[in-house]
């Protein structure tokens, strides 16, 4: 028996949308931009997949989404895109910032899919925040391991990076098919 799924996404520059379309294509379901979502329709789905991008470990658009989906929390799978290196500390920080109340992190699956960053496309607040991030990274690295990670991130901020790869959808697809 096949589960009925929906993929909801919030994408600013295309990475999250690309992953959402790949996931929806593999599951044979629809992908819907968050701004076009009919929250009343979520009850008909066995699996609700939400994807968005990270800004300072915050899942952009998730606050609004979370308030509307209390009845679907047990069917929720989340994927996030970003350019920072995935590690347990980043995962923990994402959880602490985004799962304070309403959704129990114990029952929610969260996956990281590496994203894309093109400096010339970044404007306004995002450009300002990336400049601050760069300064913090440069001044905050205290040991060789954190220094290497900071250097990699600074390079991505200055020169851009594209780590989008369909293989990162496999973890989300496995969870959706369980």
Region locations from a protein language model:
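N-terminal beta1-alpha1-beta2 submodule of the flavodoxin-like/Rossmannoid cofactor-binding fold
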Residues: 1-72, 170-178
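FMN-binding flavodoxin-like domain, especially the glycine-rich phosphate-binding loop
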Residues: 26, 57-178
């Amino acid at each position: 028996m096949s589960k009925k799924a929906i993929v909801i996404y919030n994408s600013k520059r295309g990475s999250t949308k690309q992953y959402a379309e790949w996931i929806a294509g593999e599951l044979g379901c629809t992908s819907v931009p968050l701004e076009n979502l009919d929250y009343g329709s979520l009850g008909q789905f066995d699996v609700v997949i939400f994807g968005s991008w990270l800004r300072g470990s915050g899942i952009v658009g998730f606050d609004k989404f979370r308030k509307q989906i209390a009845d679907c929390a047990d069917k929720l799978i989340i994927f996030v895109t970003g350019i920072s290196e995935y590690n347990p500390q980043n995962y923990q920080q994402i959880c602490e910032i985004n799962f304070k109340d309403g959704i129990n992190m114990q029952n929610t699956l969260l996956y990281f899919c590496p994203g894309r960053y093109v400096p010339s496309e970044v404007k306004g607040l995002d450009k300002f925040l990336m400049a601050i991030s760069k300064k913090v990274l440069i001044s905050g690295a205290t040991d060789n391991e954190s220094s290497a990670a900071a250097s990699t991130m600074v390079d991505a901020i200055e020169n851009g990076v594209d780590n989008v790869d369909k293989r990162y959808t496999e973890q989300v697809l496995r969870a959706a098919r369980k």
